Amino acid sequence: MKRYYFTLALIVLLLGLTIWFNVPGHPQIKIGNFERSMDLIQGLDLQGGVQVLLEADLPAETPIDPQALEDARTILENRTNALGVSENLFQVAGERRIVAEFPGLSDPEKVLAVIKETGLLEFVDLQDNPENLQEGNLILTDFGQTSTSTQPTETTTAPATEGQESLASTTVYHTIMTGKDLKSVVVSRNPNTGEVVIDFTLSDEGAKIFDEYTSNNIGKILAIVLDKKIISAPRVQGRIPSGQGQITGNFTLETANNLAIQMRYGALPIPFKVVESRVIGPTLGRDSLQKSLLAGYIGFTIVILFMGIYYRLPGVMADLSLIVYALITLTLFRFIPVTLTLPGIAGFLLSTGSALDANILIFERLKEELRAGRTFSQALDLAWKRALPSIRDSNIATLITVVILFIFGSQFGATIVKGFAFTLGVGIFVSLFCAMVVTRTFMYILVDRMKPQAKHLKWFGILD
C-alpha cells in the first residue's frame, strides 16, 4: 500500500501545479531560454481575427513540390512572427494552397504586406545604367537561368510577352548574388539625416563575392532588387571588403521593417496570390463560447451528481478524478499550446465521456466481484485487471479515428477537424491516466482507510 500513498502525494503535487497554472493571473514558465506564457489561446471563431487563403501563382498544369510548399509555409510563419503577430496559424491546404489564420487581428493589411510578396532579393549589375532605370522600375534578371558570378556579362534582350507591359526594360540584367548570402539585417536611422535605412552584413561567401565585385566595378551601378523591382541603385564608390552595406530609399519605418523581414527570412520558393482575405468579428464567437461553456458546466454537474448518486463512494472518487482530469487537460492546452476553437472545446467535452467510460467499466466489474463474495481488496484487483482489455480496446479504436481525422485536417487544411481531433486525442490520453492511476489510487486508499465490510456494500453501489 505504500506505493499508493506515494502516488497520492505525487497526484496532490500535480493537482497543486495545475491549479496554480489555471487560476487568474497564472504565472509564466521560464527555464533558461525556454519560455511559455501559459495563456489559453482562442481561435478565430472565439475571438475573431483575419483569415487569408493563399494560392500558388503558377499555371494550373505546373506541378508543385510538396516540400517547397512546406518551406513556403515555414517562411511565411517566420515573417509574421517577426511582425509581432502572435498565435498565427499556417497550414498547407491541398497541393497548391496555404491557409493562414490570425486570431485577434483586425487589420489584414498589416500581414498581407509581408506574406503576399515573394521576397526574392537580388544584387544586380546595372553597369553604367544606360537605360536610366530608377527606383520602383521593374526589370528582368538572369537569376535562375545562369549561375551568379562577379564578372559583368553582356546584357541580352528578352522577347516581350504578355504581362510585361509594366517592365521598364526588356533587357536581362546579371545577378551578382541573392538574399541567401545575407547574414544579418537591421533597420536603423542615418545619424546625420535621420533617414530610415537598412544595414546588412553578408556571410563569408557573400562578402568575398561583394569584395570582388566592388573591386572590379568602381563607379558602376549595383541595384538592389526585390521581386524584380529596383528599391535602391547606389553607385559603387570603392572596394567594400567588410561584407557590410546599407540600403537606402524612400522608406518609412514600417516599410523598412517589412523589407527587412523579407530579407531576413528568405525568398518564398513559390510565388503566391491572395485568393481570399476576410475579417471575422468576435461577437458571434463570444456568444457561442458562452453557450458552450454553459452547456459544459451543466453537463459536468449532471455527470458528477449521477456518478455520486449511482455509484456512491466509487462515484465520488471518479468525480475527484474527473476534476483532476479537467485541470491536467487545461494545463496541457496552455503548455503545448493548443489554439482552442468551438470544435476543439467539443473534443475536450467529448473526451470527458471517455474518462467516465473507463471508470464505469471498472466500477461495474467491481460490483460483480463483490457480489461474487470477493473481499474489497480482491475485488479491486480483479476489477482493474478484467476491465483493462475493454478500456484499452475502446480507447485504441477512438485514437485510430482521432489520427485519421487529424491527418485529414492536416492534408486539406480543415482546421476545424484538426482542432477537434487534437483536443480529443489529448483528452483520451489524460483520461486513461486518470482512470488507471488517479481513480485507482483513490479507491485503494479509500478501502485501506475505511476497511469496509459486507454491511458497507451499499456505499459501493450495491443495493440488492
Curated annotation (Swiss-Prot):
Residues 145-162 have a biased composition (Low complexity). The keyword Cell membrane applies. The chain crosses the membrane at residues 5-25, 293-313, 322-342, 343-363, 396-416, 419-439. It comes from the Bacteria. InterPro entries: SecD (IPR005791), SecD/SecF_arch_bac (IPR022813), SecD_1st (IPR048631), SecD_SecF_C (IPR048634), SecD_SecF_C_bact (IPR055344), SecDF_P1_head (IPR054384). GO terms for biological process: intracellular protein transmembrane transport; protein targeting; protein transport by the Sec complex. Disulfide bonds: none annotated. It is a multi-pass membrane protein. It is found in: Cell membrane. GO terms for molecular function: protein-transporting ATPase activity. GO terms for cellular component: plasma membrane. Keywords: Cell membrane, Membrane, Protein transport, Translocation, Transmembrane, Transmembrane helix, Transport. Belongs to the SecD/SecF family. SecD subfamily. Forms a complex with SecF. Part of the essential Sec protein translocation apparatus which comprises SecA, SecYEG and auxiliary proteins SecDF. Other proteins may also be involved. Part of the Sec protein translocase complex. Interacts with the SecYEG preprotein conducting channel. SecDF uses the proton motive force (PMF) to complete protein translocation after the ATP-dependent function of SecA. This is Protein translocase subunit SecD. The lineage of its organism: Bacteria, Bacillati, Chloroflexota, Anaerolineae, Anaerolineales.
